[in-house]
Structures are given as structure tokens and as C-alpha cells.
Regions:
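Bacterial N-terminal signal peptides that target proteins for export
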Residues: 2-9
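Bacterial N-terminal signal peptides
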Residues: 10-18
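Extracytoplasmic copper-binding redox domains, predominantly the cupredoxin/blue-copper superfamily
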Residues: 22-108
Length: 108
């Protein structure tokens, strides 16, 4: 049961390598204590964005953050870890799949 919740925190963001969209788009993901029957989750499990797009993580509930998972991001991308209980954002400039989790809840 605990491993099921871990999957809720491993989120992939897929960047399209060839974007025909000249305007950047934004996505917002809420950090939540509960969503439906799941606990300690992000409001969206997968988000598809283009290079240049920004994802905003909203600290709707307390006790959460966002951290890129080591080995789960494209080569050349710097590590990223937000502060707890704070809204944060990241602009994606390198195409690829980005895995991330909530640091205090990664082993649930």
C-alpha cells in the first residue's frame, strides 16, 4: 500500500523535442494532502510541456515540496529542489522526461 503512494510522487514531464508552438504555455500543479481516495499527491500525475514552458507548483497544503529525482532528469539539467510550503516554478529548457517527488513523502 505504501509503494502505491510512492508512484503518486514520481511524476514525468515530457518535453516535446520539436515544438511548433511559438508561445510558451504554463501549467499549474497543486501539492495536496488528499485528492479523492489518494493522500499526499500532486493534482496532476503527468504534464506535457514544450521547451520554454513553465510549470508552477502551488503549495495548496502544507508539508510538501518538489525535488527532481537524481537520475530521473535529462543529462545537463541542474538539480532542482524547492522549499517546503512554498509555491515554486521551473522553466523547462532541455527536452526529455523529468521525474520528481515530494522529498518528505518519497518513501510512503
Amino acid at each position: 500500500m505504501k509503494n502505491k503512494n510512492l508512484m503518486g510522487f514520481i511524476i514525468s514531464i515530457t518535453l516535446l523535442m520539436f515544438s511548433t508552438n511559438s508561445m510558451a504555455a504554463d501549467e499549474t500543479i497543486e501539492m495536496l494532502n488528499k485528492l479523492g481516495k489518494e493522500s499526499m499527491v500532486y493534482s496532476k500525475k503527468v504534464v506535457r510541456v514544450d521547451v520554454g514552458d513553465t510549470v508552477f507548483w502551488k503549495a495548496t497544503d502544507k508539508g510538501h515540496n518538489v525535488e527532481f529525482i537524481k537520475g530521473g532528469i535529462p543529462e545537463g539539467v541542474n538539480k532542482f529542489k524547492s522549499k517546503y510550503n512554498k509555491d515554486t516554478e521551473y522553466q523547462f529548457t532541455v527536452p526529455g522526461i523529468y521525474a520528481y517527488w515530494c522529498t518528505p513523502h518519497k518513501n510512503m
